[in-house]
Amino acid sequence: MHLSRRTLLAGLASLGLAPLVPTAAASQSTVQSQSVPETAARTFRIGVPAKALSTDPAVTNDVETHRLARQVYQNLIGVDAETGETVAELATDWTFSDDGLQLALELKHDVTFHDGTKLTADVVVENFERWGSVNELLGEQRLRQVGRLPFSVVFGGYLDQEACLLTSVVASSEHIVTLTFTEPVQALIRSLTHPAFAISSPESWAEFDTALQDGLPLVPLAGTGPYRWGDTSGETIGLESTNDGHDVAVLAIPNLHERLYGLDTQQLDVFDAVSPAILRQLVQSGYQVLQRDPLAVLYLGINQAHPVMQNLHVRQAVAHALFRGEMVDTLQLAGSYVAHQFNPPSLLERSEEVTTYSGDLNRATNLLAAAGYDGEPIEFWYPTGAERVYMTQPQKLFSYLAGRLTAAGFNIVAKPVSWDNGDYMSQVMGDPSDRALHLFGRNVYVRDPLYLLAELFEQPNREFGWRNNAVTKVLAQARVEEDSDVRTTMLEQVEAAISLDLPAIPLTFPITALASGHDVEFYPISPVLDEQYERIQRR
């Protein structure tokens, strides 16, 4: 659904914020004299490109859900705001056994959830059991529609599956939890920083689980973080401070220019997903543009279940037709760069074995001819009604890429699909269709190169219609490989295999950025989106 300025203003009014509508007669003094209710003065207002899909970060791969979950819940292991290294959060200490088959986590004492429940080892055990059985909670069809979830990625499968490396989670004492594995799980501590491993109160699950039968709900769960859920019913989600800090209102504003309008009229303090299209306006207005380090990937997915896309020459023609360097130069923020593999170099350096595809129109045309392509329609899907942090203005991205593909001889059929309620994600991941190509991407939360590759490519899925038994085997081995050099080589081999077989084409490692208003002194930017709102400072 397109969010008009009227919708934006209605959302602001629901917060008690006075809409500032620019007119020909409006003056600067009028704007400055606009009164705002005292209760709203302490509310920090953030514009984001889409609304969160759920209040439970364990049941979805949605970026906006995870962004807000970090404010309400805490993990056992956290991320240092300055270095990105792992730090104690709800677990004060952790110890592996000599053989790596057990992990003991010691919990903080005297921690209480927002609903009054005490943090104990039994509570943590219940959380692990919930994460490990989310496949049963969602059911097969919906599980397929949300993509591979973090518990399965980290442990190799769910608790009822043979591939799962986690065999038991027990409360060894009131504040010690012990995990037992069939083999040592590498990078486990880093993986537990993923927002999907947030600890919530089991006493708050019942209403959520009931609502889950009808879709991903926004029913509040109780955490231990600096915020609790406020109103989640509209396009604005409220976060209420638990320690007398500022409350936060997170407004879903899909349109880039409407987010800019919100900043200009002081209805927003910050907005995310800045695009080059408005960069000059931001700079000329004196706003601060806060850039994150590139730790996300935008890619073009290829559905090999589509009869035309089954031909490798066709997929190679797609790769050569794109001219990704020009796309980055014109549609991405400065500092973004072309991706030739899925992991950014800060996680995994590209090896010489990775096949690269330079823009080459003649090569693309010749490959199509060799494949016997005869103008069959190629459905190209892209999301509407929302943007992603890693994918601003998807319509423009689609137009550029579709133009390049058409020039190479493809018969491109545009297929805009609404993002609303996760429709785009569920349709791309779910039932078979005539989809040939689609735009998607990932924000990287776990600083381990295995994670992204395992999430996307370890298991056969309907997003790519691709199965590679060798890749599956190598990723499973890398999950438990203790020699870091050997493990790195394994993951380089997987990246090389993907570059040859082309289930998807990495487009760019984009610089993502926020814009902050004149009253913002400090905003805690983070490449993994661990941006703690309680640390925000006003001038």
Ranges and model annotations:
Residues 47-98, 129, 222-223:
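N-terminal lobe/hinge region of extracytoplasmic solute-binding protein
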Residues 48-67, 90, 117, 139, ...:
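A structural "hinge/loop" feature
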Residues 93-147, 178, 262-265, 308:
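Aromatic- and charge-enriched surface segment that lines or borders ligand/interaction sites
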Residues 106, 139-204:
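Surface-exposed binding/hinge segments that line
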Residues 174-176, 183-249, 257:
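Gly/Pro-rich hinge or "lid" segments in bacterial periplasmic/extracellular proteins
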Residues 228, 236, 310-407, 493, ...:
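Append "and occasionally in soluble cytosolic enzymes with long acidic Gly/Pro-rich linkers
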Residues 235-281, 294:
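Ligand-site clamp/hinge motif
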Residues 321-349, 393-402, 427-539:
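Detector for C-terminal structural segments
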